[in-house]
Amino acid sequence: MKLAFFPIHGAAMLAIAATILSTAVVQGQPIVPAPDGTGTTVTPSGDRLNITGGKTSRDGANLFHSFQQFGLTEGQLANFISTPAIRNILGRVVGGNPSIINGLIQVIGGNSNLFLINPSGIIFGPNASLNLPAAFTGTTATNIGFDSGLFNVAGANDYITLIGTPNTFYFNLSQPGSILNAGNLAVMPGQSITLISGTVVSTGSLKAPQGNIIVASVPGKNAVRLSQEGHLLSLEIRVIDGELLAQNGQLSLPLSLPQLLAGAGGNSATGISVNGAGEVVLTAGLRVESGDVAIASSTVNSQNATLSAARNLTLVESQLLTENNLYLLAGDTVRVRDGNNAFRAIAGGNLTIQGNQNIDIFALNYPNPAFQSAGDITLLSNGNVSGDAHFAARGNFSILTLSGNGGSFVSLYDPIISSEGDVRFGDYTGTSLKVEAKGAIAAGDITITGPDTTLLGSADPDAAVLSGSAALILRSGVSTLANAANLPPNVTEGETFFASPGVASGNSIGVGAISTAGGPVILESGGDIALDAIATSGGNITLKAASDIAVTGTLQSTGGSVDITAGNLLTVSGTFTDSNGVNASISSANNGTGGGAITIRHAGSTTTPFIVGDATTNGTTGAITSGSETISPQFAVPVPPSTYTQGNIAIVTSAPSTTPQPTPSPTPQPTPSPTPPPTTAPTPAQTPTTNQPTTTKLTTQNKKHK
């Protein structure tokens, strides 16, 4: 899938009017043909409204209808009559009123795609549904482009020249109309649903099994090009030129979103309301503004899905499930919230979350990880990433900037990351953090400010440690994951997908400086451990590696114990002056008093002895001190004996391990699905500017490996 943004001059924000919703039931309005010579005929037959006539393109593949208004009340059926020769039916609404649809739309007689186009807005009420043989597109565009010409929603058209597939949606108004879906929109297997407008809110369901769902908001004065090339789907937003603007007929300014809701005759959507200030708000208290896409108390289920907002993408208490790839994209911020109901985003392929400015996630109201994928999970942002959630990937997990560097993130409550591949992120600041990977872990500086506050009673085997102290747990190269991805059958029974291999980058740990507010640091690696420094303010330090451990700085527990096991060699290169005035590399001294025990296990044997005072190969630059005992430079630990002790300091020497094994997680899980070669990370879309058109493309492509 390829998604690209081309900014346009003069994009305007939608004014949110001060309108209060009543409690009446959503009402539709009748379907009335437009008296413009298009030839559309509407014939009532009870609650069925048969739609015939219209104009066709020269090749007969495209059928055009024109309506003065288009709406359905509960129980009504709009029946588009097609033929086997008709590939696309396009119905425009020109009267200036929004379409309020609370009944059934169907197409019979042919396998035709249906396009419903109303620049004034579209509301699908709670009883709205589809019975279509092919794809459905709902849009508030002002023009639709073909390879051979342009279909004007307002004004005259030369219909016979409009040959080919509709591929471009033009939004000529500075304030494009909105779409609200409170219904249950579903298409046949293998077909697609597309909703494109200035602002999109869905509190109902969208289902396209084995097909695609695209929900996108577009700023005014933009054009969206949609094309299909094999398995590659392209959605591009670009500049509208002056010649096109001159072709428009008379267009009415659409209602603001609150006005649109009020015009529907009531609060048609569970989870959305208008507050006293005239702002549209969701149940989580988050506002919906111009350019947003909001999915609230909703279901999205398809093979591939792209939810793309020009401004904010807001996801509240919703269930997002795809058989393959899921893309959650925002020009500004991706916002995710739990509530009385859980939020889940589960992808049978890759899961990509991109907020160009910020990502703001709080989703801890579900016992299993809220974000799961059979492939990679990637968070992309140039701003703040707040990740209060549990993530489980059968591929790699990464938090990156838009340029591909490690991205920093924060968490105030409870972050847990599990990956059958590698894990990569930048700096982290927040509550206790747990990361487990079958592959490698790479991170920047890590600062733990306090314990988790939501893990009490959790089944996680480390819950007591994480919720009882400001703890850091990093485990790489594990054989099983305590919080492995547990994908439902309807996600995994789609296309065969193999995630990125967990051994692609080895199984080592590489991090920057670590500090905790008195909690433990536990690093266990199936390969090497490389880090800058650790300071725990009283917490215990545990380092365990199947191979080498290299610390460029120092280890300070300030009263806590230090327990180090290197399957091969250990080096601690930095020094500091501890509370007893000792120039130390490793210290557990507690502000001038004795501290915790220090135990070092290495495999230098007699050929590479451990030397206090020489960190070139196996040893420390400075002293090792527990406060009550100190081993000062220059001191080569004698071998034999295999264990050298001085007070509560012990250095154990052994032969190198021939087949070092990683430490498994405490709770074994079922064997995961096989994983594929890594896929290229998408190039992030950039936030449009108002003065300088640029071109940036987000490209992904479904890959099958047999």
Which residues does each predicted region cover?
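Extracellular and secretory-pathway beta-repeat/beta-biased strand scaffolds
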Residues: K2-K706
